[in-house]
Structures are given as C-alpha cells and as structure tokens.
C-alpha cells in the first residue's frame, strides 16, 4: 500500500513538472512573440490578437502555428502584411520553429545572428524586404534548413562559404541584392542543392568548372552580375540543368561545343561578349523552349540545323554580327512565337518558308542587309502581331495579302527601297497602332483608307515621293499621337478635320508643297506639343491663340507669306499680282455670274423653307425629337437644355471621346447631367438606333451610368447621362486629376464596382449585353468614388441563343482582345480581357499603351522574371495592408487576359475574387444594394471564409503565371 502511494505521488509530480514545463515554454515563447511584435512598425489593424494579457492562447494568434502535441510554436507566417521596423533578436528564442515566412514586407535592419538558434528551421523566407548588411554566418548552424530565400533586399558582402555547411539546403535564392565577391567553389559541392538564384548582384570571378558537381541542380541563374572569363568546357556535364541563365555578365570566348549535351529548356547567354560561331550542336537540343544568344559578338551564319528545334518558342539572335542568309529551315520551327534576328549583317532574301510559322507573334529582321521583296507568304502567319524590317535594302511593293494579318499591331517597313503606291489594303489591318513607311520610294497619293485605322497611334510616311493632298479622312484617327508626312511632294491645304484629333502630340508637315492658311481648328488639339509646317507655300496669319505660342518660329520658316506674332512678321497686304490677261478677265466675269446665280437659288430655297417652317410651331418642334426615359428629367424641355448650355457653348465642355464631345448641364430642380454630343448625325437605321437607346435606358444598376434621355436633331444627336463628379478612372490615373492620390482601398472599391456592373450586363440582363469598349476612360466615378460603367453607344444586345456576334471593329487599342483582332468575333470574354487590362492600370498606375510601350506585354515580361511586384504603383504598396491581395489581383488580371478566351474566368468569378479581398465590414457597409448575382456570391461568402473561397477559385485556374503559358 505504501509503495502504491509512493508511485502515485511520483506520477503526479512528473505530470506537474510536465505541465509546468509546457506552461513555462509557452510563457517564454509568448514573451518572444511580444518582443517580435514590439520591433515591428506600421501595425495599424495588424496583429491585434497578439495580446498576452487578453488572449494568452498564442497558438490562436495570427500567423502563429503550434505543434499539436507540445503546443510549441513551429511556424511563423507574417508575409505580405506591409510590416515595417526590424526583425527582433527574440526570434532566436523560438527554438522549435520549423518555418519562418516574413516575405513581402518593409522590414529593414540586419538579419539578427540569433536566428541561428532556431535549430529545427527547415524553411526561411525573408525575401522582398529592405534588409541590409551581411548575411549572418550563424545561418550555417541551421542544419535542417532546406529553403533559404533572401532575394530582393539590400544585403551586402559576400555569399558566405559557410552556407556549404548546411547539408540539407535544396533552394538558395539570394537574387536582387548587392552581394559582392566570388561564388565560393565549395557551394558547388552541395549534393542536394536544386535551385541556385544569384541574379542581380555584383558578384565577380568566373564560372567554375565545379558547377557541374551539383548533380541535382536544375535551376542555375547568375544573370546580371560582373562575372568574367569563359564558359567552362565541362558545361556539357551539367546534365541536370533545366534553366541556365548567365546573361548580362562579361563572359568572353566562344560557346563550347559540348553545350549541346545539355537538356535545358531555357538557355540564356545574352548580353555578354561571346565571340565565334553558333555551334551547330545547339540544333540537337530538342528540349529547348527559349534560346537567347542576343547582344554578343557572334559571327558566321545562322546554322540551318536550328530548324530542328521543333519545341522552341523563342529564338533571340539579335545584336550580333551574324552573316549569310536567313536559313529557310527556320520555317520548320512549328512552335516559334518570337523570332528576333535584327541588328546583324544578314544578307539575301526573306525566306518564304517563314510563312509556315502559324504561331509567330513577332518577326524582327531590322537593320540587316536583306534584299528583294517581302514574300506574300508572310501573310499566312495569322498570329503575327509585330513585323519589323526597318533599315534593310528590301525592294518591290507591299504585298496586298497583308490585309489578312488581322492581329498585326506594329508594321515597320522604314528605310528600305520599297516603291509604288501605298496599297489601300493597309487600311484593312484594323488593329494597327504603329505604321512606319518612312525613308522609301513610295509615290502616288496617300490612301484615304488609312483614315479607317482608328486605333493608330503613330503614322510615319516621311521621306518618300508622295503627292496629292493630305487626306481629310485623317480626322477620323481618334487615337493618333503622331503624324509625320514631311519631305514629300504633298500639295493642297491642311485639312481642318485634323483639329478633331484630341490625342495628337506631333504633327510634322515640313518640306512639302502645301498652300493656304494654317487652320484655326488646330488650336483645338490641346495635346499638340510638336508642330512643324516649315518650307511649304503656306500663307496668311498664324493662328493667334495663345496655345500656338509654344511652337518655335523655326516651325514656320520657309513660308514667305506667313505672318503673325509667333513668326515675328507683321501682316500686311500681299504683293500685287500682275495685270490680268483678257482670258483671265473673261473667266472671272463668268465665275461671278455663276456665283450670283447660285446665291439667288440658295436665297430662294431658304425663303421657301422658312415659309414651311413658319406654318406651325408644332411642326418646328418636330425637327428635334426629345425622348425622356426617366421621370427625373420629365420637367425639362429641349429649349431648357439649350438655354442652360448656351447652345452647347464650348465653355461647358468637360471631355472628348472617340465619337463624341461631352458637356455639363446644371438644370434647375434636378441633379446635373452630362450631355454627350455624337459626332455623327442621323444614323442610317434610325429605328434600330432608337431601339438600342431605349434598351440602354432600361438598364438600372448602381454601377452603370443611367441614360435619362436623348434628342435627335439635324444639329447633332444628344444623349443625356448621369453627371459623375470625379470624372473617369483614366483622369485620376493618367490625366490632369492624377494629383488626386488613389489608395488601395479606393482602387479595390473601383474594381469591385466595375466588375459588378459588367457582371450585371453579362449575367442579369435579358437579353444579355456585351459592353465592347471596357477601358479606364469608360469607368466614371461619382462623389464617393463609386464606379459606374459608361459609353454604351456601341453596345448591342445579344439573343440568349447565341454565343457570339460578328461586328465591325470595336474597342480601344491596348484593351482589344487579341482573339477578336484575329477572328473579328466578340463575346463576353472580350470584355473580360479588357477588364483585365483595367486591373493592371489600377495596380500599376500606368497607361494601357504609352507611346510604344504595351502595359500587358510589360507585366508578362515581369511575370517571366518573377518581378511583377516591381511594377506596382507606390501609392498602392504604401496603403495596402496585405500585399498578398495585390498578388492575387495580378493573378486575376493575368487570368482575365489569357490568350485563349476559354481559359478566362467569367465576370461572376472575377467579382467573387475581388469581393473576397474586401474586408467583410467594408462589404457590408459600402456595398448595400447589390444585384442578384452578386447577392448570391455574398451569401456564399457568409458561409465560407472569403480567402478560402478565393483560393478554391484559383485552384480551378491553377498554373504558373508566366509569359509562356498565357
């Protein structure tokens, strides 16, 4: 009995010690966590549950994960919380930690040496912060560590050789720092290392032959350092490599022959000083998807055997000194999307076999010595988006079959020997945004069809032999930013229609034979910063408006009869002409008689018309048809509107669109309205036009601008909309209002509102409606920055039984779905592509197209390099509390802009993801009246965790976000 009592007492004591030990450990870990929190800054609404007074259960704290048995802290995940401050040395007191993830914050200071005390650590990610100083040697004490990610900080010093003492290290990523010194050869003897990322540092030394000792290494990236020497001859022994990137260093010598033994998918050697020939053995590397040898000093011909690379999608050989012809065998590279051979010394003709490359997206052959014509077979490259042969010796004419290149946006044939007329068929390449035919021998007149290229940004026809008049149709180029027709033989007057071009930056007309006056209408081109009309035969007064004072006098020289303040010449009478001949006098007399007859007829008809109009006031009112669609405008007449706006005086103008001018009208006893005056008069099918307006007017949604009514008159068709106090999203991001800072919460609110409006059109309207021109300038913002979709002047209803509609060109350059550009068929997925571009604008603050830069292509290239976050607008990163939301929004934007429309989400799914990023309280407070489809999503989100819902949705579309897969 006594022995039993002793055993019981002993057992209770042991349990007591265990409980005390656990409690003591939890107490110590709780103190460590509070010390870690104390070293952070920018904690607004963050880590509120880290409170050891009111919540002692530290395992329930945000980002803290505990072991199920010992209840010790084993994982700390505070990634993408926008945390500032430093990493506390107290982190070393969490001895049982297996994972630390602090990436995507703004942590500064040095990495504490105490982190080496976390002996159980397997995963350490401190990337994308502001950490500086050396990498602590204490990290080498972490014998269980498998992943060390310190990329994109400001770390200095060498790569510690002691990292080789971590026996289980599989992934080492130190890219994007300021590390110096050589890469330790000991690092190459880590048998388990699989991923080595050292790009974007200042490392020196050479590539060691020991690099192939890493038998498990598949990713080797030292891009953008200061490495010298040659590529080791033993490079062919690196048989495990899948990605090999040694680009943008100072590597010299020739490419080793045995490099062909590699089985890499990506071989990037560009931006070095490599010499010699391209080894033919590269043509045997069947796994190659990307081959980049550009910007070196390679010589010799392009090996025809490269045509065997049937899986290669990108071939970059530009910026070398390659000679010889372009091998016709390249036409066998069936998956080739990018072929850049520019800036070499290639000769011969363009092989017709390139026309077999059905997936070719970009073909750049500029700055070589190519001769002969452009093969008409090139028009068979249905996906071709960019074609550049600038700076060659090509001749002949432009193939008429180019009209079939519906996806082409960039065409540069400048500085060659092309001749003949510019074919009218170029006007059928509807998606062109840059057309450069300068520096050739084109003759004849400029085709009027070029005025149909409504998405054109740059038109350069300079230095040719073009004659005839400058087409008035150029006034239809609503998106144009630059027109250059200098150094030709053009005659006639400067068309007044050019004054309609609201985006025009440069108008270069010098060295022609233009006559007449400079149109006053050009003063309406408020964005015009470069005007050159020198050396023509212009006369009269230079427009005296003040905005013309920004042009230098040199812009007007060489026109003897031009005068005005801007050119320093006082206007006086023109020189007396010589005495008229007898024949001239007879012609003048006959002309005067004819003119008098015409005036008499005009006066007579006018009097007859007045008699008809004076018949009754009711008939007079019939000339203008006013239709009120909502009762809030019913008390007003057309005369009220004209009186308030002084017959649409220009002082009431608040904006210009591609098809209209917009005025503000402040009516009494009602809210202000926006009046959109369409450029076109009565449409061909008036009944269809009115039916469409009535359909648009029937749409009532909090995120769609309401059409209150319309007026049809001979003086112009007017549409009456809600007036939006904060203008358009484009104005706030890119225009004169961009001084208004948009924080992340406001941008997300705008994205959610626009998505809900578009989802309503796609899923809740009967028949459903496709907007067809989603862009930032068509997203208007009220006084509360609530988004409203506008500009349904081109939207059409689609019967429920149809899945697509064929129509004329719609949309705006930079937002147009490439699939629509290729097939001319449009559906809901086209709107979703455009919405994805708007999301990218919100995230980056950049324009969809800026000069020649394309925002979508920029983000794709950064996705390739995993540097997308570098493109984020600073105002977003400063105000976003969870950078993970930004990454999700980038993912969503890239999914919306997938090349294959079938892989894009629906607007319901887009709304679901965006709503999941809005805190639940904000959703409840700021989105009180939702449409039916959005309410269903809200109900789902009440049942399930929003983040989990978003995660489930992303799983459905799971894949690596990279250029090759989008």
Swiss-Prot record:
GO terms for molecular function: ATP binding; protein serine kinase activity; protein serine/threonine kinase activity; receptor serine/threonine kinase binding; signaling receptor binding. ATP binds at residues 654-662, 676. The keyword Repeat applies. The keyword Repeat applies. It catalyses: L-seryl-[protein] + ATP = O-phospho-L-seryl-[protein] + ADP + H(+); L-threonyl-[protein] + ATP = O-phospho-L-threonyl-[protein] + ADP + H(+). The modification Phosphotyrosine is found at residues 721, 760, 815. Keywords: ATP-binding, Cell membrane, Glycoprotein, Kinase, Leucine-rich repeat, Membrane, Nucleotide-binding, Phosphoprotein, Receptor, Repeat, Serine/threonine-protein kinase, Signal, Transferase, Transmembrane, Transmembrane helix. The chain crosses the membrane at residues 583-603. InterPro entries: Kinase-like_dom_sf, Leu-rich_rpt, Leu-rich_rpt_typical-subtyp, LRR_dom_sf, LRR_N_plant-typ, Plant_RL_S/T_kinase, Prot_kinase_dom, Protein_kinase_ATP_BS. It is a single-pass type I membrane protein. Belongs to the protein kinase superfamily. Ser/Thr protein kinase family. Receptor kinase that regulates inflorescence architecture and organ shape as well as stomatal patterning, including density and clustering, together with ER and ERL2. Redundantly involved with ER in procambial development regulation. Forms a functional ligand-receptor pair with EPF1 (AC Q8S8I4). Forms a constitutive complex with TMM involved in the recognition of the stomatal regulatory peptides EPF1, EPF2 and EPFL9/STOMAGEN. The kinase domain is not required for ligand binding. This is LRR receptor-like serine/threonine-protein kinase ERL1. It comes from Arabidopsis thaliana.
């Amino acid at each position: 009995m006594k022995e039993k009592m002793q055993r019981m007492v002993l057992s209770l004591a042991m349990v007591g010690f265990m409980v005390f030990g656990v409690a003591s450990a939890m107490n110590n870990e709780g103190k460590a966590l509070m010390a870690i929190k104390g070293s952070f800054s920018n904690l607004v609404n963050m880590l509120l549950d880290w409170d050891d007074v009111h919540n002692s259960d530290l395992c329930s704290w945000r980002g803290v994960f505990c072991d199920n048995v010992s209840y010790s802290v084993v994982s700390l995940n505070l990634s993408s919380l926008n945390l500032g401050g430093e990493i506390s040395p107290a982190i070393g007191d969490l001895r049982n930690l297996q994972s630390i993830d602090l990436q995507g914050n703004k942590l500064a200071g040095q990495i504490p040496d105490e982190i080496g005390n976390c002996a159980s650590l397997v995963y350490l990610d401190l990337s994308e912060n502001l950490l500086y100083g050396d990498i602590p040697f204490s990290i080498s004490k972490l014998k269980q560590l498998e992943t060390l990610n310190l990329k994109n900080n400001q770390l200095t010093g060498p790569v510690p050789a002691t990292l080789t003492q971590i026996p289980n290290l599989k992934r080492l990523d130190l890219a994007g720092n300021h590390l110096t010194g050589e890469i330790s050869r000991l690092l190459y003897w880590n048998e388990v290392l699989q991923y080595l990322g050292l790009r974007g540092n200042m490392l020196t030394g050479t590539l060691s032959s020991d690099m192939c000792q890493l038998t498990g290494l598949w990713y080797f990236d030292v891009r953008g350092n200061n490495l010298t020497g040659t590529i080791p001859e033993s490079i062919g022994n690196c048989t495990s490599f899948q990605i090999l990137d040694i680009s943008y260093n100072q590597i010299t010598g020739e490419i080793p022959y045995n490099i062909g033994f590699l089985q890499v998918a990506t071989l990037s050697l560009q931006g070095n000083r490599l010499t010699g020939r391209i080894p033919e053995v590269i043509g045997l590397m069947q796994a190659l998807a990307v081959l980049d040898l550009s910007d070196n000093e390679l010589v010799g011909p392009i090996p025809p055997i490269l045509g065997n690379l049937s899986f290669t999608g990108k071939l970059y050989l530009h910026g070398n000194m390659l000679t010889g012809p372009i091998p016709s065998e390249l036409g066998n590279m069936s998956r080739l999307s990018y072929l850049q051979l520019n800036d070499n010394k290639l000769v011969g003709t363009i092989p017709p076999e390139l026309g077999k490359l059905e997936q070719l997206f970009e073909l750049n052959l500029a700055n070589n010595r190519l001769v002969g014509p452009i093969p008409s077979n090139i028009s068979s490259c249905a996906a071709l988006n960019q074609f550049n042969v600038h700076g060659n010796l090509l001749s002949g004419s432009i193939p008429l079959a180019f009209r079939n290149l519906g996806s082409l946006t960039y065409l540069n044939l400048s500085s060659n020997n092309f001749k003949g007329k510019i074919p009218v068929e170029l006007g059928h390449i509807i998606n062109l945004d840059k057309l450069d035919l300068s520096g050739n021998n084109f003759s004849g007149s400029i085709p009027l069809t070029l005025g149909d290229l409504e998405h054109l940004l740059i038109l350069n026809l300079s230095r040719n032999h073009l004659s005839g008049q400058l087409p008035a149709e150029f006034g239809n180029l609503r998106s144009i930013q630059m027109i250059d027709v200098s150094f030709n033989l053009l005659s006639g007057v400067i068309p007044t229609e050019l004054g309609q071009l609201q985006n025009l930056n440069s108008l270069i007309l010098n060295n022609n034979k233009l006559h007449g006056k400079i149109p006053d209408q050009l003063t309406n081109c408020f964005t015009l910063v470069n005007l050159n009309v020198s050396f023509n035969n212009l006369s009269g007064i230079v427009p005296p408006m003040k905005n013309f004072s920004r042009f230098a006098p040199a812009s007007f020289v060489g026109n003897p009869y031009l005068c005005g303040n801007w050119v320093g010449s006082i206007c006086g009478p023109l020189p007396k002409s010589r005495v008229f001949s007898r024949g001239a006098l007879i012609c003048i007399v006959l002309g005067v008689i004819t003119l008098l007859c015409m005036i008499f007829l005009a006066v007579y008809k006018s009097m007859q018309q007045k008699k008809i109009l004076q018949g009754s006031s009711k008939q007079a009112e019939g000339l203008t048809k006013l239709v009120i669609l909502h009762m809030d405008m019913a008390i007003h007449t057309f005369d009220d509107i004209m009186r308030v706006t002084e017959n649409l005086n220009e002082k009431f103008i608040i904006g210009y669109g591609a098809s209209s001018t917009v005025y503000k009208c402040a009516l009494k006893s009602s809210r202000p309205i926006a009046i959109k005056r369409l450029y076109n008069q009565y449409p061909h099918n008036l009944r269809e036009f009115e039916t469409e307006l009535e359909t648009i007017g029937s749409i009532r949604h909090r995120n769609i601008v309401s059409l209150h009514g319309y007026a049809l008159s001979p003086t112009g068709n007017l549409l009456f909309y809600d007036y939006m106090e904060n203008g358009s999203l484009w104005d706030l991001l890119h225009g004169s209002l961009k001084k208004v800072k948009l924080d992340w919460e406001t941008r997300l609110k705008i994205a959610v509102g626009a998505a809900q409006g578009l989802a309503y059109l796609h899923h809740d309207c009967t028949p459903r409606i496709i907007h067809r021109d989603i862009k930032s300038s068509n997203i208007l913002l009220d006084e509360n920055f609530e988004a409203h979709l506008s500009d349904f002047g081109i939207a059409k209803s689609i019967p429920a039984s149809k899945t697509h509609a064929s129509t004329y060109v719609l949309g705006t350059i930079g937002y147009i779905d490439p699939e629509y550009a290729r097939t001319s068929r449009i559906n809901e997925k086209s709107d979703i592509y455009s919405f994805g571009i708007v999301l990218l604008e919100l995230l980056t603050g950049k324009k969809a197209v800026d000069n020649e830069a394309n925002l979508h292509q920029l983000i794709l290239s950064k996705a390739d390099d995993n540097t997308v976050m570098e493109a984020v607008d600073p105002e977003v990163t400063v105000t976003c509390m969870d950078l993970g939301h930004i990454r999700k929004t980038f993912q969503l934007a890239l999914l919306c802009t997938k090349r294959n429309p079938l892989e894009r989400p629906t607007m319901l799914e887009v709304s679901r993801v965006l709503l999941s990023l809005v805190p639940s309280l904000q959703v409840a407070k700021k989105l009180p009246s939702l449409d039916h489809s959005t309410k269903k999503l809200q109900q789902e989100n009440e049942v399930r965790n929003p983040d989990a819902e978003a995660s489930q949705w992303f799983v459905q579309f799971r894949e690596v976000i990279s250029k090759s897969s989008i």
